[in-house]
A protein has these predicted regions:
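Structural signature of tandem-repeat unit edges
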Residues: 1-12, 22-35, 45-58, 68-90, ...
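Consensus positions within tandem repeat domains that build extended binding/scaffold surfaces
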Residues: 14-17, 37-42, 60-63, 116-121, ...
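Generic short alpha-helical hydrophobic face used as a protein-protein interaction/packing hotspot
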Residues: 95, 119, 306-308
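Short, aromatic/basic amphipathic alpha-helical patches
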Residues: 280-283, 300-311
Length: 319
């Protein structure tokens, strides 16, 4: 299938109706279409242009996810539900100011309050993106698989980085989160293998499960003194990590949080009371060669604590 023109008799396009029709290069939607279902055109990577007729009132989640070839998105004037204001090359829900679908040439207007889940999912051609300060939330999988994205700065209003929001963005090299972020969701930056520098603000209280799993480019990691919990597998398979500093604020570390960080040679824990460890937190770490440095008066406590006591070389430092 390379071309698709829908007749005026078609009013709705069902779930996954044309999903993964990667050979589709031209699409003409008639002015009779009122709804486009979930994943209707997902993975139609050959599409370069999309014009949404003014008749469309409903678009399902991930309707255009993975349309990596899209260069231009236009919503016809007169559409009561959606627009592509300011030539933004995106589809925006007028009522909520939510951007629900974008492409590699999208420019996000200052009026957008939310980037919806899956809005840019699989948009591998996206290389630059400026998020305006109007954006307060970013949905799940919003930028998953945007492998061409190299830099990311989140606006100061974003409080939560939701699950898988930037997973598999392997081109990202540096990540700085604003002081507004309090929680990093599960798999949020999973397999962002290009990240070499990670700066987390003092506002972050929890790091979700597998949040930075497979970030193999990370070599050093210092967590801020606000983090209380580290989720299961949060930094698992960060095989390039050599030094780790855990703050005094950490109370619990989930199962396998640092599993298979095989190059770890130095861990500094600033907590006087050893954080509670889940199952095999440091599995795959050479506990004979990796040095564990803890507060001077806490060496005995660490030698007794579960998982910490598996390290052969525990020594104290003076504050």
């Amino acid at each position: 299938l390379t071309e698709l023109t829908l007749p005026n008799s078609v009013k709705s396009i069902g779930e996954s109706a044309f999903a993964y029709c990667s050979g589709l290069t031209e699409l003409t939607l008639s002015n009779s279409v009122t709804s486009i279902g979930y994943s209707a055109f997902r993975g139609c990577s050959g599409l370069t242009e999309l014009t949404l007729p003014n008749s469309v009132k409903s678009i399902g989640e991930s309707a255009f996810c993975g349309c990596s070839g899209l260069e231009k998105i236009t919503v016809e004037s007169g559409n009561s539900r959606y627009d592509s204001r300011d030539n933004c090359n995106s589809i925006i829900d007028k009522k909520t100011n939510t951007l629900i679908a974008g492409c590699k040439n999208s420019v996000i207007p200052n009026s957008v309050a939310r980037i919806d889940g899956l809005a840019f999912c699989g948009c591998s051609g996206l290389t630059e993106l400026t998020l305006p300060n109007s954006v307060k939330s970013i949905g799940r999988y919003a930028f998953q698989g945007c492998t061409g994205l190299t830099e990311l700065t989140l606006p100061n209003c974003v409080r939560v980085v939701e699950a898988c929001a930037f997973a598999y963005c392997s081109g990202l090299t540096e990540l700085t989160l604003p002081n507004s972020v309090t929680r990093i969701g599960n798999h949020a930056f999973d397999s962002c293998s290009g990240i070499t520098k990670l700066t987390l603000p003092n506002s972050v209280k929890s790091i979700g499960r597998y949040a930075f799993q497979g970030c193999t480019g990370l070599t050093e990691l210092t967590l801020p003194n606000s983090v209380k919990s580290i989720g299961d597998g949060a930094f698992a398979y960060c095989s390039g990590l050599t030094e780790l500093t855990l703050p005094n604020s950490v109370k619990s570390i989930g199962d396998g949080a640092f599993a298979y960080c095989s190059d770890l040679s130095k861990i500094t824990s600033l907590a006087e009371i050893p954080p509670m460890c889940g199952f095999k937190v440091f599995n795959g770490v050479n506990k004979t060669n990796c040095e564990l440095i803890v507060p001077e008066g806490s060496v005995a406590a660490y030698t007794r604590a579960e998982d910490w006591n598996k390290f052969s070389n525990i020594r104290g430092f003076s504050k």
